[in-house]
Amino acid sequence: MAIVERILIRATANGPSVELDRAAVAPGAAIAGDRYANGSGTFYEAGKDGQDVTLVEAEALEATGLSAEDSGRNVVTRGIGLNDLVGKRFRIGAVELRGNRLCEPCATLRDRTGVFRELVGRGGLRADVLVAGEIAAGDEIEEL
């Protein structure tokens, strides 16, 4: 069974991560309180797809030794291959999303953590919210 292990946000690109038990998400809005919701994300571009939610596999973090907080991703998953969700619809709890593109590691992550090459092809997924709702730690993830 694929699940959400953790939900994290950052108010600013280099600020500390804050863990949430649950989070409201809506199309084009990102997670309330996250840097992409307030337009201050490193790669923020108004109206650009793939900025609502970022996901990363717990298994990839464990293999590289990178913490969920340092990854900068919003949702840590377990038991699902996120690369397989590019271009596909999936559900977390009652929220429907579409995998937009891979969330490859960037220079900001490399400079902050020293991790780069190890996450190429394993850096996670950028997703668009299609149906608003709430996601929570422990929610099941299901491909539609």
Stretches found by the model and what they are:
Residues C103-A107:
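Well-ordered mid-protein domain cores that form the structural environment of catalytic cofactors
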